[in-house]
């Protein structure tokens, strides 16, 4: 973690499951969770899962007592310390913003959360409906801020100028551009491949993928 920024970007994937860390960080940010290492940089309320061999370490959410305590219009990057250094690596910023939008579009919105808040309120005899206002305001704010920080672009394939082509090779590498909501390619109805994200401080949105042409 003490490596210079350029070296950290090249080495961090060897020890951290960065994608999992960015998704957990997005959840903490959206939910306005206080008293936690993830948002406030406090030195507690973090657990680590270290797989055998020590690669792919995952940070686990822990002791989330103070939910919805952050401002609904607070920063969309609330991590500090070394996590913020990892998050600010261009590729990881792109991944993090993608997770924020994915959660806002799927689960962190009042339409999805209303029945769950009602359900768990009934289970413990409490009224959680007031939380919907925070969720609505926070999700709208985060969606707006992401679009402001990184304006949307259209998906495109830039290999061969985006034109059709033919090859006798057993695989081909395609390159292109895509916004933060582009992470994988559907090769068949049952097969997805993650794109290799190519991001720099000047341009976040490059991608490439090696596609097998012979089964």
Which residues are covered by each model-predicted region?
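Catalytic-core segments of enzymes that bind and process phosphorylated/nucleotide-bearing substrates
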Residues: 1-156, 166
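Long, low-complexity serine/threonine/glycine- and acidic-rich segments characteristic of extracellular
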Residues: 159-215
């Amino acid at each position: 973690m003490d490596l210079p920024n350029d070296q950290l970007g090249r080495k961090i994937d060897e020890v951290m499951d960065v994608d999992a860390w960015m998704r957990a960080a997005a959840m903490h940010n959206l939910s306005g969770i206080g008293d936690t290492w993830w948002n406030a940089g406090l030195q507690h309320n973090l657990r680590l899962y270290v797989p055998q061999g020590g690669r792919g370490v995952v940070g686990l959410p822990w002791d989330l007592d103070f939910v919805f305590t952050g401002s609904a219009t607070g920063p969309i990057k609330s991590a500090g310390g070394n996590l913020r250094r990892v998050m600010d690596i261009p590729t990881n910023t792109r991944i993090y913003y993608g997770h924020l939008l994915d959660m806002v579009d799927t689960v962190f919105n009042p339409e999805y959360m209303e029945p769950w808040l009602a359900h768990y309120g009934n289970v413990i005899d409490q009224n959680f409906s007031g939380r919907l206002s925070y969720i609505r305001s926070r999700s709208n704010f985060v969606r707006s801020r992401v679009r402001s920080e990184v304006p949307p672009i259209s998906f495109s394939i830039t290999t061969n100028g985006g034109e059709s082509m033919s090859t006798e090779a057993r695989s081909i590498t395609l390159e292109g551009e895509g916004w933060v909501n582009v992470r994988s390619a559907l090769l068949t109805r049952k097969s997805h491949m993650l794109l290799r994200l190519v991001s720099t401080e000047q341009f976040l949105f490059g991608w490439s993928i090696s596609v097998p042409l012979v089964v």
